[in-house]
Amino acid sequence: MKSTSATKFSVLAAATFAAAHGIVSDIKFDNDWYTSSLVYQDPYANPVPERITWSFFGSGNGPVADFTTKDIVCNGNAKAAALVADVKAGATATFYWTVWPESHRGPVMTYLANCGGDCRTVDPSSLSYFKIDHAGYENGEWISDKIIANNNSYSLTIPEDIAPGNYLIRHELLALHSAYDELGAQFYPMCANLKISGSGTANPPGVKFPGAYKKDDAGILVNIYNGLTSYQIPGPEPYKSGSGSSDNAAEAVSSAAAEEPAAAATSAAAEEPAAAATSAAAATSAAX
């Protein structure tokens, strides 16, 4: 659902997430705020809220157990979202995570995939994903630490020159605290349905999930405690609007979260039934 103001910010209290894991709780595209699929609230609501984000209720807030399987696309046994967010090319997207544990250091990566038709009926593993943003380790600091310092939020720009259409946006954090073991890297992916408008024509080449990440990739099988001086972010280089070249966006950590500092303490109670009534008008419905 789309909330009418930042006061709907539904980041869960830290006590809700006793385990050291996390999910995206909210997404903002420019000034439009959407509550994400909430794994510990939505399954017990009646009716279950419709979201723009794909749900993975059975997986909780933990990582994908095996990133060589289809679970790496949109998380474990992900189910298609009912709603679609209308987003302009060139918009700023801000992802708000639940309280992220400091020990879970690693990169952040975001991809887009053109669904061709309706993203709500597509097999996400059949799509081609092009990276639009990533950030990792720079000047001795992990991007995950910057995200924590910015109210557990991260911002990036939707490429302004991509062709309009229906897209999945795939956003993930990768925790590397156990990545010294094979399959020890912890991926936390999620997907959301977008309808991107604009006058662009770019259709960048992409990669497949699963397949884009290998067990022995330098940025996946790595010991971050062993004198790390540099880090290679997994996957391709990000598409840079207008040129097709890469663009490391480590500086894109969101400061927007500071606009509503009190909202970070808002519990799931903020997701009152009345807000659910606004969802049909706030996002594209199944009829769109």
Curated annotation (Swiss-Prot):
Keyword Signal applies: yes
One annotated GO biological process: cellulose catabolic process
Keywords linked to the UniProt accession: Carbohydrate metabolism, Cellulose degradation, Copper, Disulfide bond, Glycoprotein, Metal-binding, Monooxygenase, Oxidoreductase, Polysaccharide degradation, Secreted, Signal
Cofactor list: Cu(2+)
InterPro entries, sorted: AA9 (IPR049892), AA9_LPMO (IPR005103)
Coiled-coil zones: none
Low complexity bias spans: 249-270
GO cellular component entries: extracellular region
Catalysed reactions listed for this entry: [(1->4)-beta-D-glucosyl]n+m + reduced acceptor + O2 = 4-dehydro-beta-D-glucosyl-[(1->4)-beta-D-glucosyl]n-1 + [(1->4)-beta-D-glucosyl]m + acceptor + H2O
Top-level division of the source organism's lineage: Eukaryota
Note describing how the cofactor binds: Binds 1 copper ion per subunit.
Applications (biotechnology): Lignocellulose is the most abundant polymeric composite on Earth and is a recalcitrant but promising renewable substrate for industrial biotechnology applications. Together with cellobiose dehydrogenases (CDHs) an enzymatic system capable of oxidative cellulose cleavage is formed, which increases the efficiency of cellulases and put LPMOs at focus of biofuel research.
Residues that bind Cu(2+): H21, H104, Y188
Record: glycosylation sites: N151
E.C. designation(s): 1.14.99.56
Protein name, per record: AA9 family lytic polysaccharide monooxygenase A
Gene field: LPMO9A
